[in-house]
Amino acid sequence: MEKLMAAFLALGAIVPFGVKGADADVDVSFKPGAWNSNDWVVVKGPRWDYKHGFVQKTDCIENECPDVPGDVVYKKFHSKVYSAMVHKKRGVMGQTVSSTMGFDYRMAPLIVISEKLDKSPEGEPMFGEHWEIVLYDEGLNVWHHMIKDGKPFWYKAAYLKVPFKKNTPYNVEVKVSKTRKGVKEMVVKCGGYEMGYIDNDLPDSFYAGIIGCEGRNQFYDFKIK
């Protein structure tokens, strides 16, 4: 049943992604029956030859993973469990994107923002340049992903080394804005910690969503406000 639900979520979210939704607040609970897969676009990662949706659980959704313990997922299947989707309603600079998320071993649920969606050779929605704001057991990372010479390229743009516990929901907040001097910055908050960095490549408007990867991850809600 869970696999059928995951397939439904993936298929139901494939929509014409060139049409941009209106800027508006988003407030989604991922409890059963509380959200609509048609409000989302399932997106392929440029590094992977597959595209996964999410699996509905009792009080959250999870990335697609084999039915094995969390440490086994991380150690043996970390490259096979990437699930990603973005909300059709775009966010804009000054809004806060947030999600309550967790992991059952070490990593790595995240919030993703992307100015636009590219297409895979098969015509499916795929990330080009995008930013990943990642929660894991040793802190927070911001990864800036790009396509360089036709190949995926990424680097760690910012990080904070602090401990986070497994099997514990954390609310991660991300805000892109301009400082008083007009430069763009990203501020990330989680668990009472805060970090920020300057990046003038950050988009003025963007798709925002979630990615589960490198282990079994849980997502309880998602907001753009």
Question: What would you call each of these model-derived segments?
Answer:
Residues 196-221:
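Flexible glycan-contacting loops in extracellular carbohydrate-active proteins
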Residues 90-92, 104, 163-167, 203:
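Surface-exposed coil/turn segments at beta-strand junctions on protein surfaces, enriched
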Residues 99, 166-197:
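Carbohydrate-binding surfaces in secreted/extracellular proteins
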Residues 1-4:
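Positively charged n-region of N-terminal signal peptides that target proteins for export
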Residues 149-171:
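Short, aromatic/His-centered strand-loop micro-motif at the edge of beta-sheets
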Residues 7-16:
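Bacterial N-terminal signal peptides
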Residues 21-95, 135, 164, 179-180:
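Low-complexity, Ser/Thr/Pro/Gly-rich disordered linker/stalk regions
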Residues 67-69, 73-145:
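Secretory/extracellular carbohydrate-interaction modules
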